[in-house]
Amino acid sequence: MLPLLALLLLIGPSVCTTAGDREELAFGAEAESWVTVNLKGIPVPSIELKLQELKRSRTRQFYGLMGKRVGGYQLGRIVQDLLGTRGLSIEGTCRQAASQQRARPGAVTRESLQSREEDEAPLTTSNV
């Protein structure tokens, strides 16, 4: 129905103009004005989507398919903002979980000894 309406809008004015003035068919600026039809009021989703895809660059099309960008934002940037500047170290969390599982209630690990030594070390200040 919609393509038929667009075709009717394109052909209608040209048929009316040529039927009234068969003698004067000049291809100038005036002749082109009756051929132009404004279709801004009629949205066609499939045409709009194809135009948007054509306007995007090749890299944006590729990364859109691969899921690298979501809604114009890069996923890495969002994750980095959420986690802070250090990020998340999977290796470190796995090691900590494994050492906590192996440690007995009374056992002392090397990391805990180092942190205790740092906490108990006296702070030296100088008055100059």
Swiss-Prot record:
InterPro entries: Tachy_Neuro_lke_CS. The modification Methionine amide is found at M66. It is found in: Secreted. The keyword Thylakoid does not apply. One of its GO terms (molecular function) is signaling receptor binding. GO terms for cellular component: extracellular region. The keyword Secreted applies. Keywords: Amidation, Cleavage on pair of basic residues, Hypotensive agent, Mast cell degranulation, Secreted, Signal. It comes from the Eukaryota. Residues 96-128 are annotated as: Disordered. Residues 1-16 form the signal peptide. Residues 17-54, 69-128 form a propeptide. Expressed in hematopoietic cells with highest levels in pre- and pro-B cells but not in later developmental stages. Also detected in uterus, skeletal muscle, brain, spleen, stomach, skin and lactating mammary gland and in cells of myeloid lineage including dendritic and microglial cells and macrophages. In uterus, highest expression is observed in non-pregnant diestrus mice and in day 5 pregnant mice. Compared with mice in diestrus, decreases 2.6-fold in uteri from non-pregnant mice in estrus and 10.2-fold in day 17 pregnant mice. Detected at sites of chronic inflammation such as granulomas. GO terms for biological process: mast cell degranulation; positive regulation of cytosolic calcium ion concentration; positive regulation of saliva secretion; regulation of blood pressure; tachykinin receptor signaling pathway. Transmembrane segments: none annotated. PANTHER family: TACHYKININ (PTHR11250), TACHYKININ-4 (PTHR11250:SF2). Tachykinins are active peptides which excite neurons, evoke behavioral responses, are potent vasodilators and secretagogues, and contract (directly or indirectly) many smooth muscles. Hemokinin induces plasma extravasation, mast cell degranulation, muscle contraction, salivary secretion and scratching behavior. Increases sperm motility. Induces potent analgesic effects and may play a role in pain modulation. Promotes survival of bone marrow B lineage cells and of cultured LPS-stimulated pre-B cells and may act as an autocrine factor required for B-cell survival and proliferation. Belongs to the tachykinin family. This is Tachykinin-4. The gene is Tac4.
